[in-house]
Structures are given as structure tokens and as C-alpha cells.
Amino acid sequence: MKANEIRDLTTAEIEQKVKSLKEELFNLRFQLATGQLENTARIREVRKSIARMKTVIREREIAANK
């Protein structure tokens, strides 16, 4: 998901997506440890998506404080 798409969502929706992506990341890491993961690049994609979403949330917090 791109940053522009994330900015169109509400903060609550973003937080919900972060929660679901964290669960997915946990499952991917578990699959990696047990040797069942085929697409290892997915871990990196999920981590970057979480970071993008947290960045947008933080931008909104900073804008609200000004």
C-alpha cells in the first residue's frame, strides 16, 4: 500500500491495518523459522508497510500539535 493511499484512510483504519499486518508478520516469521515460507520478500514488504503507516500516524500527531 502506498503512502498516498494510506493518507486517504482514517487514523482508526490505519491502526487496524497496522494490527493486522503485525499479526501477518508474526505468522510469516513463524513460517520462516519452520521452513515453510516460500516468499521471503513478503516479510520485508510487510515491515515497510507497517513503517509507512506508523509514519503517517506520526505526521498526523505532529500536525495536530501545531
UniProtKB/Swiss-Prot annotation:
Keyword Ribosomal protein in the entry? The reply is: yes
Query: Which terms under GO biological process does the entry name?
Result: translation
Question: Record's CDD domains?
Answer: Ribosomal_L29_HIP
**Domain of life from the UniProt record:** Bacteria
What are the protein's GO molecular function terms?
structural constituent of ribosome
UniProt entry keywords in alphabetical sequence: Ribonucleoprotein, Ribosomal protein
User: GO cellular component terms?
Assistant: cytosolic large ribosomal subunit
Has keyword Ribonucleoprotein? Answer: yes
Family under the similarity heading: Belongs to the universal ribosomal protein uL29 family.
Name recorded for this polypeptide: Large ribosomal subunit protein uL29
| Species the sequence originates in | Bacillus licheniformis (strain ATCC 14580 / DSM 13 / JCM 2505 / CCUG 7422 / NBRC 12200 / NCIMB 9375 / NCTC 10341 / NRRL NRS-1264 / Gibson 46)
The gene coding this protein: rpmC
